[in-house]
């Protein structure tokens, strides 16, 4: 496959060239490449090529193939799915049914990432991660309270997460990272206090990174005043001050990765109190991130690529996440000028007008998604 006249970033440098894909890899990046042996040619003039996103915090409740198609539409090529047998990234859930999993056997069967859902068996899990050099994702089970503690929770009479206790378990992991020099990714970080603790422990020698839900950078808890079930997300959204603190942390590279936190809302309940938690957002991931983070100048386009593709690939030790020769050809082609509106009524972003739209998804050199009438063959 040959991508003609592609605009892309090589590190921080904006370039325009032709990109050849062959045998799952990006094999050539040069100007004026010619097709070889009936090679498929995709005209990318006025379009942008970037690495496909990697989402490390996805819950599948709607069927894996349906989830994958939604992900492709949102520019997400690889998924780490928590609760199913199918996942692009082979994960090892360290604890199942309150018992320690057979981590050694699962590693030998191809496990690529170790997930700790609680701080039980912390010592054993940490030593397995260190011994097998496994990326360790700390994704603690949610308390499933509707709001964070504060004036709005009291005003609305909703159950809330007590902020005084939200970091007590995480601190144990932070200290283990420092003491044993184990790299850890802390999932669903939505508190400025958590980010300050991460920085403090890293200053002491820990190897911690933070991953934050995209929704928490776009929305704040004021949406709860409408009592709409689509906003019932775990962990809960923050107040405006907390949201602004997250944006500032992202701008200052204190947040390493973003996640759609996608979870199908497996409920038709009309009342906020009775509805299921969830965040149906992955199908609009690129457009939401581009509109609210890049267009609104929270971060640069280059930084968006890093926090949604490059840093994830490095954490997983994958040969992907950048547009470079000899990297895996996991790419998306986008139209940055296209305008769309979120149509999924269960999405927290429903009704929002967005900029940027995925035209084509390519995984290992093969097209997996194409928007109708997009990316014409030349």
Where are these regions (language model features)?
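Divalent metal-coordination and catalytic microenvironments
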Residues: 6, 24, 46, 57, ...
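Metal-cofactor-binding active-site regions of metalloenzymes
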Residues: 55-61, 74-104
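Histidine/acidic residue-rich metal-binding segments in metalloenzymes
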Residues: 105-258
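His/Asp/Glu-enriched, well-ordered alpha-helical/loop segment
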Residues: 158, 164-171, 176-181, 253, ...
């Amino acid at each position: 496959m040959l991508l003609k006249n592609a605009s892309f970033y090589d590190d921080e440098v904006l370039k325009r060239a032709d990109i050849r894909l062959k045998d799952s890899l990006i094999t050539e990046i040069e100007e004026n490449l010619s097709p070889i042996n009936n090679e498929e040619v995709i005209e990318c003039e006025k379009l942008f090529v970037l690495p496909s996103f990697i989402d490390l915090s996805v819950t599948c409740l709607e069927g894996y193939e349906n989830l994958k198609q939604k992900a492709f539409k949102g520019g997400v090529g690889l998924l780490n799915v928590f609760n199913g047998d199918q996942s692009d990234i082979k994960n090892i859930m360290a604890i199942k049914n309150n018992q320690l999993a057979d981590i050694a056997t699962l590693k030998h069967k191809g496990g690529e990432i170790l997930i700790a859902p609680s701080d039980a068996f912390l010592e054993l899990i940490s030593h397995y991660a260190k011994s097998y050099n496994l990326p360790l994702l700390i994704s603690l089970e949610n308390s499933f309270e509707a709001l964070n503690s504060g004036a709005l929770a009291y005003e609305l009479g909703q159950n809330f997460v007590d902020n005084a206790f939200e970091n007590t378990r995480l601190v144990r992991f932070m200290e283990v990272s420092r003491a044993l020099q184990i790299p850890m990714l802390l999932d669903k970080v939505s508190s400025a206090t958590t980010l300050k603790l991460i920085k403090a422990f890293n200053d002491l020698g820990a190897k911690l990174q933070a991953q934050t839900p995209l929704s928490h950078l776009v929305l704040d808890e004021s949406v709860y005043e409408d009592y709409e079930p689509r906003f019932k997300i775990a962990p809960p959204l923050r107040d405006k001050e907390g949201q602004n603190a997250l944006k500032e942390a992202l701008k200052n590279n204190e947040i390493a990765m973003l996640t759609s936190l996608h979870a199908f809302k497996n409920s038709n309940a009309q009342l906020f109190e009775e509805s299921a938690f969830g965040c149906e957002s992955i199908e609009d991931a690129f457009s939401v991130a581009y509109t609210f983070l890049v267009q609104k100048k929270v971060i640069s386009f280059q930084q968006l690529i890093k926090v949604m593709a490059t840093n994830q690939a490095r954490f997983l030790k994958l040969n992907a996440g950048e547009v470079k020769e000899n990297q895996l050809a996991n790419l998306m082609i986008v139209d940055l000028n296209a305008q769309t509106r979120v149509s999924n009524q269960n999405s927290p972003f429903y009704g929002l007008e967005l900029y940027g739209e995925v035209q084509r998804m390519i995984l290992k050199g093969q097209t997996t998604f194409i928007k109708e009438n997009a990316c014409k063959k030349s």
